Each structure stands twice: as C-alpha cells, then as structure tokens.
C-alpha cells in the first residue's frame, strides 16, 4: 500500500502541516519508527520527542497546533488515536485475506441460505437451515449448527463453533476457537446423582459485537443468553446460561460470569473478575481486576476487591494491610494492660 499525506488526511479527517505529496506505506510504533510510515501521540506533552524519531509522519493532538513547531510532517487531529485507527482500518482492508466463495471441501447442509459475496473456508461445516448474510466470512474449520442465523458482514475465524439455533446479528466478529451455544451448566440433584437439565434456549449476539478467542458463551436453559449491541468480550472468558450483557459493555480476559446475571450498559469488568449468579450490575459500573462480585451493584459505581466494595475504600484497606499485624499486637498489649489494672 502507498498513499500520499493528502490522501491520508482525507482518511483521518485531520489537518496537515507538511509535504502533501509525501508517500506513506504503513503504520509504525513510536518505539520502532520507519521513514515511510505514520505513528501517533495521544499526549501532546510528549510530542517534543518527535525531533529524534525517524517516522514519515506524526498524528498529534489538535490542542497543541498553535504552539507546536516542527519541520516534520504532522497531522493534527482532535483524537489522534481515533485518526490513527481510521488509517489502520484502511491499511488492514488493503491486505488480501481470503478468497471469496465456498471452498470445495466445505460441507453445506440442506436449505442453507447463502448471501451475496460470502466466503466459506476449507473443511467448514454449515448444517441444515442455516442462513449466512451478505459479505460474511467463515474461515476454515468452523462449525455452524442447524437453524442458526448469521447476519451480514460477520467474520468467524478458524475453529469457531456456533451450535444450533443461535442468532448472530450484523458485523459480529468471533475470534478463533470461541464456542457459542454450548450447554449451560445445569443439573438437578436426585438421590445423590446430578441429573442433566436440557438446555433448550439459545444465544443471541447483537450487532457490532466482538467475541474473543477461546471464549465460551452458554446457551440458555430456556429463552436466550444475550450479548447486547457493541459489546466487546476479550479472550478466555466464560459467560454462563441466561446471562444478559448490556450495550457497549467491555468484558476483559478471564472473566467468569455465572448464570442468569444481568450486566447493564457501558459496564467494564477488568481481567479475572468473578461474578456470582442471579445478580444485577447497573449501567456504567467499573470493576477492577480480580474482584469478586457477590451482590448487586447500583449504576455508576467504581468497585474493586474481594468481596467487591467501593474502589477507594478497598485501596485504603490494602494500604493498611502491611500494618495490620503490628496493630493487632498493639491492641492485644493495650487490652492486657487494661485487664491487669
């Protein structure tokens, strides 16, 4: 790929200061600059360092435009990271990734509806009565169960499993090895024997969501496990049966959410958070890494720790821990003194 800075400005929406005909071929990082590549600084206070960085162009915050002086090629943008992201999308789309069409080794069942311009990779299995929307890409070794619906512009990477009767809406990305619609962990104890409860619901993943590699989302016991619009789920995450995740939430790696829990809109669960079942987490809640959530959390709270509590309160408790043994000794000493009076 090769584009001029004039074209790059059209992509990023920024304002150029420099040679509009200069050619860019790739993105680069600040730590590994290239003379024909573009990088960015989100923090304007660090922009002075570009004098020693040999990159072809820099995207910098608009707020420093009036005071910042340099002879380097610079694009000023209100949000440099977003401008750089727009360029990355353009760069990524220019690279060939797959051949359109159905590979001859793919297995296509009866009454399958294939949209326009789709891709089904080698050794993938599409069972009966499946619908695949326009421009959807199914990479090799993917399994899609009967009566499943996959919308437009979706990408399912290698070794993804989507079991029967699930609904994947438009522009959903499912990373390699993820499993959608596995049986929920449901058993009833009868005479000291765990009897399996059939899980007859499904999973619905709403539009513009992304599911990380090797993540598992269980089908509902009845009704649906629901992943809302524009939800981002990281790798190695477990979402149990009948969980509901609200629009725009982010769930980071190794989180486990037990059954029938409801997560509101715009929630952030950091890495390795554990969530008990049958609880409600309100809109906009943020929970720090490795926290244990065992009760409802009202909207807008920032929480941390196990058991989870107010973020600042937890930090104060952690700060006090190194002195706890000394405090206990002092308490016992004073108590003994009082008793001997």
Swiss-Prot record:
Active site as annotated: 241 (proton acceptor)
Associated pathway: Bacterial outer membrane biogenesis; LPS lipid A biosynthesis
GO biological process, one term: lipid A biosynthetic process
MF-aspect GO terms: N-acyltransferase activity
Keyword Lipid biosynthesis attached: yes
Pfam families membership: Hexapep, Hexapep_2, LpxD
HAMAP family hit by this protein: LpxD (MF_00523)
Name by which UniProt lists this protein: UDP-3-O-acylglucosamine N-acyltransferase
Organism whose genome encodes this protein: Elusimicrobium minutum (strain Pei191)
Gene name of the record: lpxD
């Amino acid at each position: 790929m090769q584009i001029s800075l004039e074209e790059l400005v059209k992509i990023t929406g920024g304002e150029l200061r420099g040679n509009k005909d200069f050619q860019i071929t790739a993105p680069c990082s600040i730590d590994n600059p290239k003379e024909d590549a573009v990088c960015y600084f989100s923090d304007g206070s660090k922009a002075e360092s570009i004098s020693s960085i040999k990159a072809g162009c820099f995207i910098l915050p608009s707020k420093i435009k009036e005071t910042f002086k340099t002879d380097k090629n610079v694009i000023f943008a209100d949000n440099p990271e977003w401008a750089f992201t727009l360029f990355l999308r353009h760069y990524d789309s220019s690279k060939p990734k797959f051949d359109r069409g159905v590979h001859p080794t793919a297995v296509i069942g009866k009454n399958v509806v294939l949209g326009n311009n789709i891709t089904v990779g080698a050794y993938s299995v599409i069972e009966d009565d499946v619908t695949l929307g326009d421009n959807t890409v199914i990479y090799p070794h993917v399994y899609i169960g009967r009566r499943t619906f996959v919308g437009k512009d979706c990408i399912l990477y290698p070794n993804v499993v989507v079991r029967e009767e699930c609904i994947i809406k438009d522009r959903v990305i499912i990373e390699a090895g993820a499993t959608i619609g596995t049986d929920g962990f449901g058993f009833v104890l009868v005479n000291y024997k765990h009897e399996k409860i059939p899980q007859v619901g499904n999973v619905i993943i709403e539009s513009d969501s992304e599911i990380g590699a090797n993540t598992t989302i269980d089908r509902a016991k009845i009704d649906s496990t629901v992943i809302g619009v524009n939800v981002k789920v990281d790798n190695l995450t477990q979402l149990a049966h009948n969980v509901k995740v609200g629009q725009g939430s982010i769930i980071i790696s190794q989180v486990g959410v037990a059954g029938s829990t409801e997560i509101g809109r715009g929630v952030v669960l950091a890495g390795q958070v554990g969530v008990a079942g049958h609880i409600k987490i309100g809109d906009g809640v943020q929970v720090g890494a490795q926290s244990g959530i065992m009760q409802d959390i009202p909207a807008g709270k920032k929480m941390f720790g196990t058991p989870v509590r107010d973020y600042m309160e937890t930090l104060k408790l952690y700060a006090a821990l190194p002195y706890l043994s000394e405090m206990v000794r002092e308490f016992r000493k004073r108590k003994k003194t009082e008793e001997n009076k």
